[in-house]
Structure formats: structure tokens, C-alpha cells
From Swiss-Prot:
SUPFAM superfamilies, sorted: TPR-like (SSF48452)
Annotated keywords: Cell projection, Cilium, Cilium biogenesis/degradation, Coiled coil, Repeat, TPR repeat
GO MF annotations in UniProt: intraciliary transport particle B binding
Name used for this protein in its record: Intraflagellar transport protein 70B
A GO cellular component annotation in the UniProt record: ciliary tip
Domain of life per record: Eukaryota
Gene that encodes the chain: IFT70B
TPR repeats: 11-44, 45-78, 154-187, 189-221, 393-424, 425-457, 459-492, 544-577
Region described as Disordered: 130-154
Function: Required for polyglutamylation of axonemal tubulin. Plays a role in anterograde intraflagellar transport (IFT), the process by which cilia precursors are transported from the base of the cilium to the site of their incorporation at the tip.
BP terms from Gene Ontology: cilium assembly; intraciliary anterograde transport; intraciliary transport
Amino acid sequence: MAGLSGAQIPDGEFTAVVYRLIRNARYAEAVQLLGGELQRSPRSRAGLSLLGYCYYRLQEFALAAECYEQLGQLHPELEQYRLYQAQALYKACLYAEATRVAFLLLDNPAYHSRVLRLQAAIKYSEGDLPGSRSLVEQLPSREGGEESGGENETDGQINLGCLLYKEGQYEAACSKFFAALQASGYQPDLSYNLALAYYSSRQYASALKHIAEIIERGIRQHPELGVGMTTEGIDVRSVGNTLVLHQTALVEAFNLKAAIEYQLRNYEAAQEALTDMPPRAEEELDPVTLHNQALMNMDARPTEGFEKLQFLLQQNPFPPETFGNLLLLYCKYEYFDLAADVLAENAHLIYKFLTPYLYDFLDAVITCQTAPEEAFIKLDGLAGMLTEVLRKLTIQVQEARHNRDDEAIKKAVNEYDETMEKYIPVLMAQAKIYWNLENYPMVEKIFRKSVEFCNDHDVWKLNVAHVLFMQENKYKEAIGFYEPIVKKHYDNILNVSAIVLANLCVSYIMTSQNEEAEELMRKIEKEEEQLSYDDPDKKMYHLCIVNLVIGTLYCAKGNYDFGISRVIKSLEPYNKKLGTDTWYYAKRCFLSLLENMSKHTIMLRDSVIQECVQFLEHCELHGRNIPAVIEQPLEEERMHVGKNTVTYESRQLKALIYEIIGWNI
């Protein structure tokens, strides 16, 4: 049947062939045949009706609406085509046009109930929740005789559940969806609604349970969808955006699973959830999947991530989180001018997609670049408002515990956690203003003011440790904050940031706790050896960075003989230890060494100089494909490919050594 044209079909068989294609869900082929037939008979009711149906099944809703519009004009007495046109326009997110067409059917009692449902759905999608609720509440009394009472009641539960969800009443929404699921039996889309409501109420375990059921049933009933194939590295064809895929709710389930894992900071599991979903070509991806791919691969592929988010912002509709996430990522990567431009160009989106908190936060962060004092005042106002909320919620939690009211405790604790998630970024933005000025005592002062709320928060503890470390006379206090972080992950120590381990080792050394430093380094070495045994080709940088930071410390103290030697040994073997980050630390020490040599403030033995030259030659050999600098993702002027390598920079450093010591190259 593949590639069959109208001319090849025997006389009298055309209709049978088209219906066979539709029965087998081969809608694209049916569209080809029908398109050719309609060129010969453009007013064919059967042809237009089947073409509209096929377009609808292919989710080409705008094209389906055009077919039904033509049918409505050709056969105005058949109002069902207006209803189909309105439904297709709604699916195409053309809400104003859908409302206009649906309004024409309101006076027909046969369609009244379905039109009310459609109007309620349109208002829901437009964000008019009171209008949608008003229409939903009319439905039960209007539907008498059209459907069985059980189905009618289930639909009512689902509709109210959706409204409650949009209104932020997630627990109540869960109850409605759960009741509907019990009444109707398993339905993938309804099970997904329940999982989404659980997710929004932070009941991740319950959400994952329903997601697992959707995935298991999808795999069992439709193995042809290729779930998990991409993750396993199997090259598979796109399954397309078929009706079957839509009915399984697999795409929605995997996206929600990715979001939960991302929230729980299980970033690898989040990425795996996205690759586990049925394979589709990039141009076939839905907006939510595209948004999540951009977000979860941002660290590895930031340029691609920005392109996807910018593309989504031009679509209608786009995931509501897109606008805020793009602005936050611009600020994270310090593209403050771009963030300001996007805000200015999309002023109409601010009220709809940014909460007052997020807008005020972004405004303050962008202001930091030109008026840090003004920005600090804005952030201080925001912090003051949030601390007031935190105090009130603390009292509510205490009162609820006193009254043994579990529901009130749960509600207050959830609100407290949500407020804390807003407060921490504001606090860090305030601290960053003084951090950039290297005014570390002021940063410490800001953190001390927040100890009442943040003393158990990992991000706060980590940054307190960093600011104490940077003051150079508070290593003992820094240990008090670094140690709990490291001990928390001691069994999987490579999950701890290398710089945290390095700073803790330096703090131990600076407080004469050399045994503790050595023990920690042995632990890291043992973990890396085990990992190397399991995956011999994997590069590991933790111990290398620890040694580099220790070497840097000795260089900073003027002990270049020992410091440079430590730096050189830390990068052996070069094929596993040399990378962009490790080269960054190493070259800083060499540049400091060369600066002091050129000023004649230090003298090095010939053997040390020879060791330096040999080291740079090794880096030259192994660094051909290693970038010396990771370029910013949106830079207009890209660095020269040949110059942005460890090889090129190591040659430059070697040439400088020869020039300073007067050797001939």
C-alpha cells in the first residue's frame, strides 16, 4: 500500500482503500489519496469529511478546521460540522475563533451540552477560571438524557478536579481525580492528572506510583512504541505523534517523571526519563518535552538550550514556565542585557507568566549590574517580606503541632518550604553583590542575619563555608561547615563537588590537621580507583583538583618548588586527568610562577625548570582536543578553534619560560 496513488487504485475500490487506511491508522497516506481526489471534486462532502477526520487524528488541527469550515459552508443545514470546526479550532489554540463558531450553536438544543463543555474548556485554557467554573456547574442540570448518570458524574468530577488544580487547591483536586478514577476504572490521561496533582502537592512518592503504572501499561500494551530504546543506545525510528501515543499518556508521564527527579536533584535520572520516552524526531516534539530537554541539558549544551527556549517563546501556546526560566537562565549565565531586552519586548507576558515575587527578583538581579546599591535595597525589601512570612508560618507549625492537627502541620510545612525556596535565591543575590567586591566580612554578616531560618539548609551552609574559607583566618570555622556536607555523602564521596573537598583539605592543612587531610585524600583515591576499575575510560578529576588546589596554596605562599611539583604530579596520567578545569588551575600557578620569575623575586633550580618544560610538553601532546576555555553559549564572536586548546596555551607558556630564562628554543 506504501506509495499508492489515486491513479493506481482500481475503479470502484477508492472508498474501500481509504477506509482500510483509516482503519489501520495510516492517516498520512489517506490524506495523500483524499487530497488528490479533492482536486478533482473539491466540493465532495465525503472527501472533505474524511480529510478533516484524518487531519484531526494527525493533530493537524488548523487544517482539520479548514475542512470543517468548507463543509459548514457547503452544507449549512448540518450544524455538526460547525461543532467539529469549533473543536478543531480549540485544539489548535485558536480560542477566539473557536468561541465565535461555538456561539452559533448555542440555540440548538441537540448541541447545547457539548457546546457548554467546549466553551468551559476554552475559558479554562484562556485562564478564565471563574467563567469556566460557571459553565461547568451548568452541565449536570443541562445534560439530562444525553448520557448515563455515572458517566455524567465522572465527567463532572474530572472537570472540577481540573479547576481546583488550576486554582492551586491540589489536595482537593487529588480527591476529585481519585474518585473519578475509582468510578471509571484505569484511564491513562486521568491517572496522569492524579499524578500531576500529587506532584504539585509535593507528594512525589504517590505521583511516581501512578506514573509507573502508566509506563508499565504503555510498555505492555504497546511494545511498538520503543520505550527505553534510546536510553539503551539502540538506533530506532521515530514513532511519530500518533493517536495511540497520545492515548497512552506516555509522553506526559515521562515528562512528569523527569520533573520529579529534577526536583529531587537526581539529574541523571531526570535526563534518563526524557530519553526513555518513545522516540520522535526533534521537529515532532511537543512544547513540554522541548522545554524539559532544554532545561535538563543546560549544563552540557547551553547554546542549544537557549535556542529551544527562545523558539518556544515565539510559539502559541508555550509551557507557562518558559518565560520565567529563560529569564532566570539569562541571569545565571550573566546575560543581563538579554534578560532586560526580553522583559521589555514581552511586557504583555509579565502579568500572565511571572509572579510578583519572580518579577521583583529578576528586576533586582538585573539592576545589580548598573546600580548595585539600589539592587541591594530592592532585594532587602524582598527578603524582609519573605522572612515575615517565614516567621508567621513557623508559629502556624508550632500551633498545629500543639493542637495535633496533622493536616494543618502538613499545609504549613509545605508553605514554609515553598517560601524558603524563594528566600534562599534572594539571600544569595544579596551576598553576591558583596562577594563580587571581595567584601567577605559583609557577606558573612548577611549570612549570619539569616541563620534563624537557614541553619539547616545545604545551600546556605555551603556558601557560609566558602565565605569563611575566603577570609583565610577562619579555616577552623570553615571546617565546621564543610565537614557535615562531606560526611553526609562519605559513602559516595565523588558526589561531593571537587572544590568542596579541596577546600576542606586546605582547611585541614592550614589548621595543622594533616592526618585528616591525608585520610580524606585516601578516601577519594580509593573511590576513584574503584570507579576506574568499573569504567576504565572515564575521566576523574576529584583527587586531581584537590592536589591542584593544595599546590596552588603553596604557590600562593611562595613555595613554588613544592607547589609546582604538586601541580605537575596531580595531572598524571594526562589522558585521564587533563581537562579544561584542571588546566585552568594548573596554568594559573604557572602564570604566577612566570610573573615572579620575570620580576626576579624568586629563583628556581634548573631541575624544576626542566620539570616544568616536560610537563608543558606532555600537556601539548595530550591537549589537542581539550578546550582551554569553555566559551559562553551566546557569544557572537567565537574564539579561534586552533587557539582555544590546551596544546596552544601550553606552547605559549613554554615559550614564555624560554624567554624569561634566556634559553634558545
